[in-house]
From Swiss-Prot:
Function: Acts as a chaperone.
InterPro entries: ATPase_NBD, Chaperone_DnaK, Heat_shock_70_CS, HSP70_C_sf, HSP70_peptide-bd_sf, Hsp_70_fam
Region (Disordered): 598-627
Keyword annotations of the record: ATP-binding, Chaperone, Nucleotide-binding, Phosphoprotein, Stress response
Family membership: Belongs to the heat shock protein 70 family.
Record's protein name: Chaperone protein DnaK
Membrane as UniProt keyword: no
Gene3D superfamilies the UniProt entry points to: 1.20.1270.10, 3.30.420.40, Actin, Chain A, domain 4 (3.90.640.10), Substrate Binding Domain Of DNAk, Chain A, domain 1 (2.60.34.10)
Species, as recorded: Rickettsia peacockii (strain Rustic)
Biased composition (Low complexity): 599-610
GO molecular function annotations of the record: ATP binding; ATP-dependent protein folding chaperone; unfolded protein binding
Keyword Phosphoprotein: yes
Up-regulation conditions: By stress conditions e.g. heat shock.
Pfam families: HSP70
Amino acid sequence: MGKVIGIDLGTTNSCVAVMEGKEPKVIENAEGERTTPSIIAFANGEKLVGQSAKRQAVTNHRNTIYAVKRLIGRNFIDPMVKKDQGIVPYNIVKADNGDAWVEADNNKYSPSQISAFILQKMKETAENYLGDKVTQAVITVPAYFNDAQRQATKDAGKIAGLEVLRIINEPTAAALAYGFEKSASKTIAVYDLGGGTFDVSILEIADGVFEVKSTNGDTFLGGEDFDTRILNHLIDVFKKENGIDLSNDPLALQRLKEAAEKAKKELSSAVTTNINLPYITADSSGPKHLNIKFTRAELEKLVDDLIEKTIEPCRKALQDAGFKASDIQEVVLVGGMTRMPKVQEAVKKFFGREPHKGVNPDEVVALGAAIQGGVLNKEVTDILLLDVTPLSLGIETLGGVFTRLIDRNTTIPTKKSQVFSTADDNQHAVTIRVFQGEREMAKDNKLLGQFNLEGIPLAPRGLPQIEVTFDIDANGIVHVSAKDKASGKEQKVTIQASGGLSDAEIEQMVKDAEQNADEDKKRKELIEAKNAADSLVYSTEKTLTEYGDKLSSDDKGAVEEALAALKAVLESEDTALIKEKTESLTAASMKIGEAMYKAQSESQPAAESAANDEKIVDADFQDVEKK
């Protein structure tokens, strides 16, 4: 079994790590950064990922996709999707299956596809470091992700060419990294406030056993919401001062978003910052500039309710685990937003203790995923991870009631069966509708999917016995079966959301991704060949000018001919031809090298003679009489 990489697929940034010896290690990307922006852009038929996509966002906002994790596994009519539509500059569209997709460069992409592009970048980063192919990964998700979101994340891995060995909850991964190679037994809380989601998990750690007791959270609360508050504040201030509403100017909005994120980060360490955006817009009187002094106190006032929203899930998680705040021995902070002093203050106030800041909040989740990868390929031993399902699972029964089969915070993997019957006389088929959530009526919960069990022998209602079995695997993904005990007829399914990607769609996306990877590789080879050729042309022309007179007319003619041939193909798209002409010029240029060496050899004795002459010093001597 080869190396298993751990990937933190984040809303704002992503990170990849691997076990190196007995320690997990974060891998730097090609730009030398330890995290990569979770941003994809399409420009002139080219796909950009990470920092390169982020750099051009201002001028290409319609085709720059970010925070897609907030859309993954969601239906287009989801209220959270509607909320996002009013914030992001790119188009969110309704897919044929009812899911929320994004539109860029006149193409539609599923959130799983966009996520796959980011995962491909993480995969390439690991392969460049390891010098070997990577095919297996552990990918993290928010603990409060439902089945559809987990399945969509797994699909993203498959599209990226990865076998996803395990989907692991982000707080659990953080706890793994925190408790790795620590022998002390502790009850900890992991408070994870990232770019787009919030999770809190309560765990007991003892002798290498990491047992999650409960989890809670909000999959639509994170740093993006903090940025939006600052952005709206800047729009309001500018409107009051200049009478111009920037909310309808996409270019200005993108600049404001970047400025808001930058100011938020600066105010984690400073108490005041200046937001200066020259030429933000213009009217009949000329260009307008935005220059606003922004304080930490103003920021805290703007986002106070968002921070407060994280406290109720903490309270519920403690209650579900059967603990009081005073029972928690350590609070581990995860996610970039936990650098904000006001967030740390709120955590300290609720748990009654100073939070632990000994882990890097941007990297700890990827490190934990790498450790879990090490467990799965036997590199790491003596660790047992017991995670839980975040939401209750059940089916719709008579009257639209939600009947739970598996309660939230049940340790996974788990399996539970219950016998149901028909609601009508002579009913030959039943539809099993599977829901996930905590409300008492099925319609108020998340419909994960449905399937039919047919061929039930005709009988009065209430007589047939239909056994429904829920099986949740270690990834938190749901498998359901229904069996008529009289006839033995059985129907088994891995729940696929009412939307979701079909197997055929996933396979097509895998092929597209492989094709794009080949095209990207060919494009890179072409650029590298052109760069090498261009460099050779420049150096040859320079040396030809300096030493051309040292060559015979035949040799000089051969070099000039090869030089002209290479220059003629520099603008072509034929990599092989450019390489061929480059090799020809390299061979012809050997004659220049010989001429250069000969010229330097001839000048060296004269130079040495001159140097020796310089060492001879004529001196006048004068006798000095002693007095």
